[in-house]
UniProtKB/Swiss-Prot annotation:
GO molecular function: ATP binding; ATP hydrolysis activity; ATP-dependent DNA damage sensor activity; endonuclease activity; mismatched DNA binding; ribosomal large subunit binding; rRNA binding
Function of the molecule: Endonuclease that is involved in the suppression of homologous recombination and thus may have a key role in the control of bacterial genetic diversity. Acts as a ribosome collision sensor, splitting the ribosome into its 2 subunits. Detects stalled/collided 70S ribosomes which it binds and splits by an ATP-hydrolysis driven conformational change. Acts upstream of the ribosome quality control system (RQC), a ribosome-associated complex that mediates the extraction of incompletely synthesized nascent chains from stalled ribosomes and their subsequent degradation. Probably generates substrates for RQC.
Pfam families: MSSS, MutS_V, Smr
Protein name as it appears in the record: Endonuclease MutS2
Organism of this sequence: Halothermothrix orenii (strain H 168 / OCM 544 / DSM 9562)
Keywords: ATP-binding, DNA-binding, Endonuclease, Hydrolase, Nuclease, Nucleotide-binding, RNA-binding, rRNA-binding
Lineage: Bacteria, Bacillati, Bacillota, Clostridia, Halanaerobiales
Record domain Smr: where: 715-790
Domain of life of the organism encoding this protein: Bacteria
Annotated Gene3D superfamilies: 3.30.1370.110, P-loop containing nucleotide triphosphate hydrolases
Amino acid sequence: MEESSLEILEFDKIIDRVQEFAATIIGKEIISRLQPVDNLNYVKNKLREVSSAREILEEYGRPPFGGIRDLREIIEKADKGIVLSVKEVMDVRSTLEGVRELKKYSREIGTGIDDELQDIYSIITEKFDRLTPLKQLENEINRCIDEHGEIKDSASRKLRSIRREMDRIEGKINDKLNSIINNTRYQEMLQDKLVTIRGNRYVVPVKSSYKNTFSGIVHDQSTSGLTYFMEPMAIVKLNNRLGELKRAEEQEIYRILKKLSENIKEHTRDLSDNLEMVSLLDVDFARARFSIEIEGIEPGINDKGFINIRGGRHPLLKVKPVPIDITVGNEFKTLVITGPNTGGKTVALKTVGLFVLMVQAGLHIPAEEETVISIFNGVYADIGDEQSIEQNLSTFSSHINRIKRFLGKADARSLVLLDEIGVGTDPREGAALGVAILEHLRERGVTTIATTHYSEIKSYAYSQDGVENASVEFDMETLQPTYRLLMGIPGGSNAFEIALKLGLPHDIIKDGKELMSGDDIKVENIISDLNEERKKYEQLKIEIEERLEAVKKKEQKYDSLLTDLEKRKKKLITEAREEALQIIKKTRKESKEILRRLKNKEFASRSDIDRVENEINLNLKETEKEISEKRQNKDGRTRVKEISCGDQVRLKKTGQKGEVISVDREKGEAVIQAGIMKVTTGLDEVAKIDIPDDTKDELFHSYQVKKKSRVSPTLDLRGERYETAQHKLDKYLDDVFLAGLKQVEIIHGKGTGALRKAVHTVLEKNPHITSYRLGRQEEGGSGVTIADLKS
C-alpha cells in the first residue's frame, strides 16, 4: 500500500486505537506493525479470529493477560548460559503464572454449547491449547525465591546453614554492642546510644575528643567532624566472621541462580512458543475489544472490486456520524459523488478507503451485517493536501502530482479515491481534465470513487456506461445537508433555491438563471427531475414495504392457523385410534392391579374383593360404551357437568369411580380419591355420577374401619434417601387417610435438614393434609413433624 494514502486515510490513528487495547508489550509491537494485506484467505482468517475472540469476550469476559512479561532478552541470555538476576527469574515466574491462568480461563470456554458455537470458539481456543504450562519450573522458582524477590532459606541446605550462623554471630555482636553503649564507662565517650553500619561493619558514634581513648577502629566521620564512627575492638573478630559468612551467602545465592538459569535454559523453546502464542492471543482480543467499541462487524469479502457498504460510520469522527450506504464495483466501476460543501462527500470517500484498509489489516468495521468489502492490491487516495478530514485544503499541482503517480500504478485490482477532481484551476478546463482522468481509469478497469462540483462530470456520469452518480442530500427547508448519501442521483448546486429562501430578490435570481449556459440548465433540470422521481420512488417504496409487511403478517397468521388445524386433525384421528386400542387394555391392567393389592391387604375381606371385582366388570362395560360414544362425537369431546369437591365421579379412561378431593379450575385439573388410590386428572376426563346417599361411601368406609386398627400414627423415615422417603410418605398418607386418623407424627431427624425438606414438600402438596408443624420440645423438636389430616 502507498504510504501517503495510508496517512491521508488516517490508518495510523486506527492502529493507535487498537494498540490501546493490547495488554502485553509484544502484542502492542505486533499491532503497531499491522499493514493491509491483499491475500483474500489471510484476510478471511484474520476477520474470523476477531469474530471468535469477540464472541468469547462477550460471553466469558477478558482473558487474564496480567503477569505476562517480555522475556525475549531473558531467553536470549539463558540460551547463552548467562546467569540471570533475581528480577529476571521473577519475570519468568510471572509469565509462567500468567500462562497457567490463561489455560485455566480457556478451560471454561465452550462447555455445554452447540456445535456451531464450538466451531466459532475453536478458532481461538486452538491457540489456547498450544500454550504449555511449565508447572515444574514454576514450582522450582517458587521454592527458591519469595514474592518479594528474596532468596528463601529453603533454596539450599548450605544457604540455610550459612544464614543460621550469620544470625548467631549477629546476635553476639548485638549483645556486645548493647553492653558497650549501656556501660557507664563509655557513655561519656559516645555521641548517642545507637548502633549503625559503615562499610558493612557494625560501629558506634564516638565523640571526636575521645577517638584516641575509645578502643576501636575508625570507619567514618560525620560532616561536622564532631563524631567518629568506630568499630569496637571487642567485635572486630565477630565482624570479620560475619563478613566471611556474607560472602559465602552471596556465593551460594549465585550458585542457586545459576542452577535456576540452567533450568530456564532447558525450557527456552517452550517459553518462546508460549510468548509468541500469548502475544497473538493478545492481538486477537485487542482487535476484538476495538470491534466492540466501534460496534463493528465482520463484513463479507471478495477480490472482484465489489464494495457494498450498508450503514457505514467513519470510526474516527468525534460526533456520531450519519450512516452511509454506498455501492461500487459491480454494475459500475466508477462512482461520482456530488453535493454541497461540508455535506459529507469527503467523509464518505474516506470512509470507503479506511474500511478497505481496516478489513485488509484484519479489523472489523462499523457497519451493518450486509456490508461487503473488496480486497485491493493498492489503495490510492487524493484527498485534500494530506489533511485531516476536518479540513479541505488542496492545490491543483499537488492533485496532479498524486494523480500522475496513481496512473502509473493503478490497475483492475486497485481502488482510487479522488476528492474534488479537477479543482484548483479554470472550472471548464478542470472539468474536462477530470472527465478525461475518470475515463482513463474506467477503461483500465480501476474501481474509482470521485467527488466533484462540476456539471460536466455529472453529465459524464449520467451518460457513460459503467459510471454512476451519487449525491449527499440537502434539506431545502433547513438549508442544511443531511449527510445521507443517495445512490443514482447527482447533486444539484441548489444556489438559486438557497438564495431565494434567504431573501435574494426574484429579478436577480431570474437574471442569474438566464446567464447560465444551455447545458448547465439542462443538467440542473435533469437533476431536479431525478430528485422528484426519487422522492416519488421513496414514498412508493415505503407504501409497498408497508403493504408487503401487512401481507406477510396475514400469510404468517393463515399459515399458523392451517398448521394448527392440520395438527388438530391428526391429533384427533390418532387419539381416537389410540383410545379405541388402549383404553380397555389399560383399564383391565389397572383393575387387576387393584385386585392384587386388595388381596395382599390383610384387612380386605372376601366380600370386599368380590364387591370391587363386580364394580370393575361393570365399569369395563361402561368404558366400552363410552368408547362407542366417543367415535360418534366429531371432536372427541363430551360436555361435563360442573365438578366440585365432594362430588362422586367416574374416570372416563378407566371407568373407576371416586370422590373429588380438590379442584384447580385454572389448570383444569381435579384430584380424585378412587378407592385406595388418588388420581390427578383433567376435568374433561371425569364424569359426574349420582349415587344414593346411603350407599355413597360404603366401600370406602369398609376399608376405613378395617384399616384404622392396622395403621400406626407414627412414621419413622430416618436413614431413608430423599426420593424413597417421599414415596413412603405419600403411600403412608393415603393409608392413614383411609384409616380415618386425624393427626400423625413423622420422624425425619435433624441432620442436614434435607429429609425434613423432603417431608414438608410432600405435605405441602398432599390433598389430605390441612396443616403441619415441627414438633414441640417434648415431641422431639425439629426432628419431628406433626401433620393434621382432613376429616
